[in-house]
Regions:
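Intrinsically disordered, low-complexity Pro/Gly/Ser/Thr-rich segments with frequent PxxP/GP/PP motifs
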Residues: 227-272, 279
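Short acidic/polar inter-strand loop motif in beta-rich domains
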Residues: 278-286
Length: 383
């Protein structure tokens, strides 16, 4: 019925009119969440919601986390509980809490700005585990940049700050958060989406013996609408390959099968993988026959530990007022007594480092860090 527009009697009236006009439509509105009069309602701010608490909310019942999005009893005129950007813990709480009886939909999640969308599989592991969880809508589909040329003549995508005079308020790159670039070029996040959403999953049973499980994630189609292939690979080469016979398997069901690769010589220290894939068997309105719809890679051998006979040498330790010196033959290491940093490392007089090795717990901030979660402020003590 709307987006980020508050909640009140006007929305109740819109819902009633919609149900009267077309009772087959379900009503969704994220703004209609939580009834403050409910005895279990907890008005917790966004900052407090990040803090795990343990609070008794009813006789013999304990809730691990109470946040705005885990509050009960959304208004009766919405058919589903709609939430934005819940944490995994909050989403699991919604999925399991007995006071929630309606299905749950994420009207926005997996904000795809900059280097992002890497947590998608964690959300879908939860969604597939709980029938109450319907899924969600990634914000958003496409970048809203405008084509222009930079000073060197190269085409680039312009956004807030590229047009306004200095000092004028704008939203910066907060419109560059899609799965596609403005010219419909596929961005890396889209490949993660394809993998997480693929209709067929290949799971390990005993890959070393060729045993795998094929899971049909479809709601209506059998596995026989696809063709299947396999490859046995080392790090660089295809060693064996063939087609894979998958019995017709109903939607939501799975089947265990064997991949018919032949015994092969394994080199110590090498890794070997099964690559499995599914393809459209016939032409579809959205894809030609042979379009790859699913893929997986399963390890069939662990990396063997390489044995090295290390030379046995005597280590001499010398203590100084400000450092410790460790020597063994022509190798030298110096550690600062005050900081604990390794300040020097050399072999045959040749330095291996150009300065002290310091612990670094801070990575470069992503767009979502800077523009959304504000980690540079909330977690700056790790800098």
């Amino acid at each position: 019925m709307g987006n980020e527009s508050g909640c009140g009697p006007a929305f109740a009236a819109v819902s009633a009119w919609t149900k009267d006009a077309d009772p087959t439509r379900f009503i969704h509105y994220e703004g209609a969440q939580g009834v403050p009069e409910h005895p279990l309602y907890r008005p917790i701010s966004r900052s407090q919601a990040a803090v795990a608490t343990s609070e008794v909310v009813a006789a013999g019942e304990t809730a691990a986390r109470f946040a705005e999005m885990a509050n009960p009893d959304d208004p009766a005129y919405v058919d589903i509980l709609s939430r934005m950007y819940p944490t995994l813990e909050e989403l699991e709480f919604l999925a399991e809490w007995p006071h929630v009886s309606r299905p749950v939909l994420l009207c926005e999640y997996a904000h795809s700005m900059g280097n992002s969308t890497g947590g998608l599989n964690d959300y879908w592991t939860l969604i597939r585990r709980h029938k109450r969880l319907l899924g969600g809508h990634i914000w958003d589909w496409i970048d809203q940049g405008i084509e222009r040329r930079d000073a060197s003549g190269r085409i680039c995508w312009a956004y807030g700050g590229d047009f306004e005079p200095a000092g004028e308020v704008h939203d910066g790159n907060f419109c560059i958060n899609g799965l596609l670039a403005p010219d419909r070029t596929v961005k890396p996040a889209m490949y993660e989406c394809k993998y997480v959403f693929q209709p067929i999953a290949f799971e390990p049973v005993d890959p070393a013996q060729g045993r795998i499980r094929v899971v049909n994630r479809n709601f209506f189609s059998s596995t026989d609408v696809y063709d299947y292939k396999w490859e046995l690979r080392d790090e660089n080469h295809v060693l064996q390959s063939g087609t894979l016979a998958v019995p017709p398997t109903a939607p939501g069901e799975s089947v265990e099968i064997s991949v018919p690769y032949k015994p092969f010589r394994q080199i110590p220290g090498a890794e070997y993988w099964l690559r499995l894939s599914a393809y459209e068997a016939q032409e579809r309105p959205y894809a030609e026959a042979g379009w790859k719809v699913a893929a997986e890679q399963l390890k069939i051998s662990a990396l063997s530990a390489l044995r090295r006979d290390l030379p046995q040498g005597r280590v001499v330790v010398r203590e100084y007022a400000d450092s410790l010196l460790f020597t063994s033959g022509s190798a030298k290491i110096v550690i600062s007594r005050s900081s604990g940093y390794l300040t020097s490392c050399s072999l045959d007089g040749c330095p291996a480092i150009c300065g002290p090795l310091k612990p670094d717990f801070w990575r470069a901030a992503t767009d979502n860090d800077r523009r959304g979660w504000k980690t540079d402020v909330l977690l700056d003590f790790w800098k």
